[in-house]
Every structure is written in C-alpha cells, then in structure tokens.
Amino acid sequence: MKNKVTTIFLSDLNPFSKSIEEWASNKALTIERIESKSQDIDELVDGVVVFHENHNISKEIEELQGLLDNSNRPGHRIDINGTLAATKSNFEMWLERNKPSKLLFLGSDELPKNENLERFLSNLM
C-alpha cells in the first residue's frame, strides 16, 4: 500500500481485526477501532476493503459496505483464495484510482484460519 494509506479502521474486536493489527504493527499505519454500527462511519473512512473466501460474505458486512457505497465511499473486495498476482494487481489499481488514506478493513472471524490471508497481507507492502 504505497499509495498513501495512513489509517486502517477495524470494526469490533474479532480474530480478523486482531490479524490485521498484528500485520500492521510494524508498518507505518495507524489502527483505529470503530463500532460497526457507528452512525458517522461514512465520515471517518475514504473507502472499504472486504476480505472474503470464495465470495462468502456475511449479511452484516454486506450491509455495512452498502451503507458506505450509498455515501459514495468506494469499496473493494479481496478473495483471499484467488490468484495472488491478479488480486494484488487489482487492489493496487483500486488504490491508485481512488487514492484513499483511511480505509475500513472488514472480514469474517474465520478468515485468519486461512493461510492465504497472511500470504496476501505479507505481499501488500
């Protein structure tokens, strides 16, 4: 994420959020926690990134992404079981096009059990 992302927002305290915090701990990123039902979430973030496995996305995450989409906040979905090179390239193009500095990362509690999450995160920077 060489594209000036400075802050990652994480909703709730769950295994996915903990994985992202661990990954970001040695990066030049600020981690902020917000409640997923926060009324002003669209004022806090510039975009949302939804991590998923094979398009398995919870209703709550779908609704939150929809709320941000209605507020003209760009969203990107990352299938951690997809091809790493293509997924990384698409994400980098999305970052370049939208130029977000504050992103909300969302993912299910089950994602950290998939070794592809760590593999993808380690290739982000």
Predicted regions and their residues:
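Acidic/glycine-enriched connector segments
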Residues: 2-102, 107-109, 113-121
